Each structure stands twice: as C-alpha cells, then as structure tokens.
Amino acid sequence: MALSKVKLNDTFNKDQLLSTSKYTIQRSTGDNIDIPNYDVQKHLNKLCGMLLITEDANHKFTGLIGMLYAMSRLGREDTLKILKDAGYQVKANGVDVITHRQDVNGKEMKFEVLTLVSLTSEVQVNIEVESRKSYKKMLKEMGEVAPEYRHDSPDCGMIVLCIAALVIAKLAAGDRSGLTAVIRRANNVLKNEIERYKGLIPKDVANSFYEVFEKYPHYIDVFVHFGIAQSSTRGGSRVEGIFAGLFMNAYGAGQVMLRWGVLAKSVKNIMLGHASVQAEMEQVVEVYEYAQKLGGEAGFYHILNNPKASLLSLTQFPNFSSVVLGNAAGLGIMGEYRGTPRNQDLYDAAKAYAEQLKENGVINYSVLDLTTEELEAIKNQLNPKDNDVEL
C-alpha cells in the first residue's frame, strides 16, 4: 500500500471516543499549595532580584520562586481556574507579607517575608542576607548602584522566567538532555542580563526549573497559560519582549511535535518523520487542524510521552524539497541531506534509531513509495540488501 493511501481515521476515531467521556479524572496538587495574588507580586519580583545579584547564588529555590511570581502576575483567581480546569483538586494557601524576626550573627533583625508553605521564612531570610553581602560589594565597586543592576529592578522576575520558557520546550526528552541547548540559548539571548547580574547562572536556574516541572507537573499547566497571557499582552519591557519570543517558540514547538507525532503514530512500519513528508497535503492539513484543536499545551504532554516522535521533530527542515528529506529532513537518516545537522547529538541518535529499525526488519521500504533515485539514496545511508527493498 502506498503511503499516499494512508488515512488518519484512527486518530480521529480515538479523539471522538475520548471527547464523549462523561467523566473526568481529578488530580491532587498536594496538601496545600501557595497561590499568590497581585498584591505580593512586587515582593516576589524582589526575591528573584536578590538571587540575581548574589554572586554564586544557590538557585535551589529559584524555579519555585519564579513560578510563584508567574502566578502573582496571573492573579489568584485565574491561577485557581487554570488548575481546576486541568482537573486538579486545589487546596490553596493565601500568601501575605509579614514581619519576621530572626537572629543573624547574634543580632535579632526584622525581615519582611511571605507566608509560604513551600518556602520557609528562614530560607527567604537567608536569600536576603546573602544578597545584602553582594549588594555591599557592588556599592564599594560602583559607588552608586544603577537601577538596572539593583535587586528591585521591575524585570527581575521576567528574566528568571525567560529561562523557564527555554526549559519547557525541552521537556519532551523526559530527561535533562536539552540542558546544554538551554544554556547556550540563554547565554545568547540574555547576554545583557547576564552582564547586569552576576547571579544569573543559566545552568543552575534551568536545573531549578527542571526540578519544579518534574516534581510539580501542575506548574506546567500554569506556566503555559501564563506564557500565552503574557505574550498576548501588548507593550512591556525589553525582557517581556524576549520572553514572548522564547515562549512562543516553545509553544509552537509543542504544536509542531504533536503534528508530526500524531501522523507518525497513525502509520505503521514507517520512519516517523518520513511519514509526514510523503503524506498527501490533505492529511497534513487534517493533522494541523487536530493539533490546533488540542492546543499547544497538549503538544507538551504528547511529546513528553512520545520522545521518539519529538526526537525526529526537533531540528529545522533546511531543504523541504529534497528527495526523502532524511525523515523530516533535518536529521538526514535516509535520502538526500543538504547542510550540517543543527544538533549533532540528535542526528546521531536518530540515525542510530533508523539503523536499529532496519536491523530488526521493521522498516518496510515498499510502503514508502520511493523512486529509483530515492532508493539509491537510502542504499548510501543504510546499505540495505536488495531483497530488503520492494519498489
């Protein structure tokens, strides 16, 4: 059967079945979670700033604080709605600013802290104490600290969330294999911000967000909706503009990976990416519409559970008109490939996967509807035996 005859009815039948369910699953976010409102947004922004100005800062809690800041921008009511719509049973803790007394170096001092169940007052005080040390050092070096270098600069929280936007696009792998790419991108896009803040260490901040998203999956729902809301709001600071660009790339990646993945899942014995290239335009349109219906956030969940599909979707397609496009072109597994792989690790992993499929006799070349030229290109890549191939 030629690939052009393959239809996606199985996908839509499944979707129809799922959409007729009369019941919903309720998940729990835990005993009690912090959901801050707008009124503590400034304080959470300052907490982010304190971490950013601290040299060699401990970023263990940066991801959590960043998510609390994101929720404070959404507001308590909208955050609760997002979680409940996602099927979570929420026991919400209100967050206020209180005065906390703590002994520091033998002297009792007053601090303003937030009433958080996820972050003790002692941890908050320690963040402030360490930041004060770095701030004093900055005063000695600069004489006067310019507003954009201070811990209360209004864009501190958004700087931290830019790292989160980079991380969320890499959750598909199911591990932290995308960390190197996150660091490289952050060093490039946030170059000015890294120069401003000595405590902005992309690797440590990224690991903190990985930890948060892995440990508390409900934060993924919150962050996706926050990202959409933030990116759709006109105006804002330079960093807000950077965030919007990073997030929309991640959001789009979720839809792209879902699109290729749905199509690949519906076609048996065919290299995942190749199916999308060889399918009729009508089918591709169907998948676009299906992805749009589910939304980008659904894409994140799909790729999280289908890393093979995401593996074959992550690189760009440098030459969409090449013969077989090396299974979604950017990877160059089979067929003509023009250009250098953008990600050598992905290329090698995908090629190894292709070779493994061939060794197991899984690839059915006759289904691929190949021309003589395409078949020759495959021979150059995987050296199949003549009796393995049917035209």
Swiss-Prot record:
Superkingdom, taxonomy of origin: Viruses
GO molecular function terms attached to this record: protein serine/threonine kinase inhibitor activity; RNA binding
BP GO annotations: symbiont-mediated suppression of host innate immune response; symbiont-mediated suppression of host PKR/eIFalpha signaling; symbiont-mediated suppression of host type I interferon-mediated signaling pathway
UniProt KW keywords: Capsid protein, Helical capsid protein, Host cytoplasm, Host-virus interaction, Inhibition of host innate immune response by virus, Inhibition of host interferon signaling pathway by virus, Inhibition of host PKR by virus, Interferon antiviral system evasion, Ribonucleoprotein, RNA-binding, Viral immunoevasion, Viral nucleoprotein, Virion
A Pfam family it matches: Pneumo_ncap
Region of interest (Interaction with the phosphoprotein), residue spans: 244-290, 338-364
GO cellular component terms attached to this protein's record: helical viral capsid; host cell cytoplasm; ribonucleoprotein complex; viral nucleocapsid
Keyword RNA-binding set for record: yes
Localization (cell): Virion; Host cytoplasm
InterPro entries: Pneumo_ncap
Subunit field text: Homomultimerizes to form the nucleocapsid. Interacts with the phosphoprotein P. When in a monomeric RNA-free form, interacts with the phosphoprotein (via N-terminus). Interacts with protein M2-1; this interaction allows the association of nucleocapsid with the matrix protein.
Stated family: Belongs to the paramyxoviruses nucleocapsid family.
Entry function: Encapsidates the viral RNA genome by forming a left-handed helical nucleocapsid that protects the RNA from nucleases. RNA replication depends on the availability of soluble nucleoprotein. The encapsidated genomic RNA is termed the NC and serves as template for transcription and replication.
The protein's name: Nucleoprotein
Organism per entry: Ovine respiratory syncytial virus (strain WSU 83-1578) (ORSV)
Gene that produces this protein: N
